């Protein structure tokens, strides 16, 4: 029989009771996490979002409550009245906040029963993710996931407090908007009233927040959901959340200063950690040169070194021919890895091939010098020069890639990260920030044979590079900046184009005709002609930031109801077929799978 709550009122959360509460009469409510019958006394760990409390049913104290406790099973919802008492000597649990006390129960109500669980809710038990996602309402009871989402809520609160305190207004932008497919595919929403026409769910509030600046709101922010219909990876979701900000009458330094303050406040209030300000900066060119990527993880070394000048005249034809053909030769020193087996090196070779490299040359530095199939092709002077460039010592493993610059940097940059995983160099409790600046404005898309925006089409070129936009696009740098944390881009922003002529030129360089630009972005181009302040902003990926703050391995562990890598919600079974009547109302019909 199920009891009614009646006039009982909870007095405390389970996980908040300490020795200071000894002697208090309390009312607790929660889930029976674990029940233990000691042949007289019955112990139940009662759980809520704040933690566990041990409750004790003693027949000498309340025979009725003890009888009711005999029916309690895991995940029953229970309410108890009782007195906080010290635990007996030798039974204190120092791992729990409540570990010094227990509650001697005088009355008990069973408010709801539970079926047998499909999996246990202990954090340390490994459960298939699909099973967890199918029963997400149970999965979310696990303390580790509850802690993740509670921390997420705290980050949102701190963000709102900080930004409103710095003059930002929290303003909302539309979810039903115009499709402007530049990059990822849009999620489309058919209009019933305007048959044959569609809304799109926003990939970001970019255009609307710029228009808010044109409208004179000066400082805007929003913790906003965004949508992209793209192939998913471990750190991607079709719907994700951004901390979105925009400011008027500012330059890059103003934005960076304010946003560094936000990051420092979040880490101070949520992690009790100090972020050293100002955050280190690095240009895009330096980042690519030293680390092969534009989102370097600075928790470890393994920097890339340039060897082209040393090997261009060498007897090793593979290297010499690459340099003669306009390519480069770079490498990295895997310190102390000279003992790697041939199979392990072959695995690394297969890894770099994923990123376009044709192979991976290697050298083991031994007591007798270089040990490698390629050693014989180099002079003693060349070996000495490379040894110095690598800062190589006995026991090191030197790894080389020769190819086009992009292939070399991509493959070695990814190899650097892979080696860090293999060597255990990734400390989740270390947080290393860096701003990457001075990105290229445009890059050549070899497949589509046109220029593409490195960030997005609304990013302003450097003032001194404006003349290159049309005449030498590859030389033009952008007023763009990314904030990188432990190899993850957690924020990206730029100063925006605030002149209609420059924006129209940018669209032209991206291959949009004047008619296409007007059709897709006419409302922005029109707005730019009515007095637009210099403005810029940034968007932080909230999901990814929380993933790093909590040390989670997957972004799905910091989102309450995430999708799978196939974009499905296993709990609600979305997406799903819809009624034919609904499709007819929209003027649609499906063509099958």
From Swiss-Prot:
Record carries keyword Nucleotide-binding: yes
EC code(s) of this entry: 6.1.1.23
Catalytic activity, reaction form: tRNA(Asx) + L-aspartate + ATP = L-aspartyl-tRNA(Asx) + AMP + diphosphate
Binding-site residues for L-aspartate, renumbered to this chain: 182, 228, 455, 496
Any GO molecular function: aspartate-tRNA ligase activity
A Gene Ontology cellular-component term: cytoplasm
A biological process from GO: aspartyl-tRNA aminoacylation
PROSITE patterns: AA_TRNA_LIGASE_II
InterPro entries: Aa-tRNA-synt_II (IPR004364), aa-tRNA-synth_II (IPR006195), aa-tRNA-synth_II/BPL/LPL (IPR045864), Asp-tRNA-ligase_1 (IPR004524), Asp-tRNA-ligase_1_N (IPR047089), Asp/Asn-tRNA-synth_IIb (IPR002312), AspRS_core (IPR047090), GAD-like_sf (IPR004115)
Physiological role: Aspartyl-tRNA synthetase with relaxed tRNA specificity since it is able to aspartylate not only its cognate tRNA(Asp) but also tRNA(Asn). Reaction proceeds in two steps: L-aspartate is first activated by ATP to form Asp-AMP and then transferred to the acceptor end of tRNA(Asp/Asn).
HAMAP family: Asp_tRNA_synth_type1
Name of the protein: Aspartate--tRNA(Asp/Asn) ligase
């Amino acid at each position: 029989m199920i009891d009614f709550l009646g006039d009982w009122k909870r007095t405390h959360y389970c996980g908040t009771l300490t020795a200071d509460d000894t002697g208090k009469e309390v009312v607790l409510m929660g889930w029976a996490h674990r029940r233990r019958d000691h042949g007289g006394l019955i112990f139940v760990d009662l759980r809520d979002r704040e933690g566990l409390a041990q409750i004790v049913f003693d027949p000498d104290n309340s025979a009725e409550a003890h009888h009711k406790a005999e029916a309690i099973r895991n995940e029953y919802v229970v309410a108890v009245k009782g007195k906080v008492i010290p635990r007996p000597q030798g039974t204190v649990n120092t791992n729990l906040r409540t570990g010094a006390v227990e509650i001697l129960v005088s009355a008990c109500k069973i408010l709801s029963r539970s079926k047998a669980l499909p999996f246990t809710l202990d954090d340390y038990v490994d459960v298939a993710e699909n099973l967890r996602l199918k029963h997400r309402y149970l999965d979310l009871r696990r303390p580790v996931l509850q802690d993740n989402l509670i921390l997420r809520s705290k980050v949102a609160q701190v963000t709102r407090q900080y930004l409103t305190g710095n003059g930002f207004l929290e303003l909302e932008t539309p979810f039903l908007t115009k499709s402007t497919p530049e990059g990822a595919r849009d999620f489309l929403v058919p209009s019933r009233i305007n048959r044959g026409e569609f809304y799109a769910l926003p990939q970001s509030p970019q255009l609307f927040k710029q228009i808010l600046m044109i409208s004179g709101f000066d400082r805007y922010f929003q913790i906003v959901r965004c949508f992209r219909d793209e192939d998913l990876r471990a750190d991607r979701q079709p719907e994700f959340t951004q901390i979105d900000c925009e400011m008027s009458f500012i330059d890059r330094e103003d934005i960076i200063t304010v946003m560094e303050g936000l990051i420092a406040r979040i880490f101070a209030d949520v992690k009790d950690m100090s972020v050293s300000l100002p955050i280190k900066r690095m240009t895009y060119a330096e980042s690519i040169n030293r680390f092969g990527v534009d989102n370097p993880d600075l928790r470890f070394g393994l920097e890339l070194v340039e060897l082209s000048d040393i090997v261009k005249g060498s007897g090793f034809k593979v290297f010499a021919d690459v340099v003669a053909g306009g390519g480069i030769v770079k490498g990295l020193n895997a310190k102390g890895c000279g003992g790697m087996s041939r199979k392990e090196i072959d695995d690394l070779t297969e890894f770099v091939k994923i990123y376009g490299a044709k192979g991976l040359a290697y050298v083991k530095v031994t007591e007798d010098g270089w040990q490698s199939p390629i050693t014989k092709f180099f002079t003693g002077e060349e070996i000495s020069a490379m040894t110095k460039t690598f800062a190589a010592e006995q026991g090191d493993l030197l790894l080389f890639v020769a190819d086009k610059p992009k292939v070399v940097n991509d493959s070695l940059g990814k190899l650097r990260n892979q080696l860090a995983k293999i060597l255990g160099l990734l400390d989740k409790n270390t947080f290393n920030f860096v701003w990457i600046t001075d990105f290229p404005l445009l890059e050549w898309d070899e497949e589509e044979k046109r220029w593409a925006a490195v960030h997005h089409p609304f990013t302003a070129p450097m003032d001194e590079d404006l003349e290159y936009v049309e005449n030498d696009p590859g030389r033009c740098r952008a007023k763009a900046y990314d904030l990188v944390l432990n190899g993850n881009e957690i924020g990206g922003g730029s100063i925006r184009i605030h002149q209609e002529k420059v924006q129209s030129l940018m669209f032209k360089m991206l291959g949009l005709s004047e008619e296409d630009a007007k059709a897709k972005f006419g409302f922005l181009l029109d707005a730019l002609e009515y007095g637009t302040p210099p403005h810029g902003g940034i968007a932080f990926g909230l999901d990814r930031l929380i993933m790093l703050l909590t040390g989670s391995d997957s972004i799905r562990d910091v989102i309450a109801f995430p999708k799978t890598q196939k974009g499905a919600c296993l709990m609600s079974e979305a997406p799903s077929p819809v009624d034919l009547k609904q499709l007819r109302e929209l003027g649609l019909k499906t063509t099958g799978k």
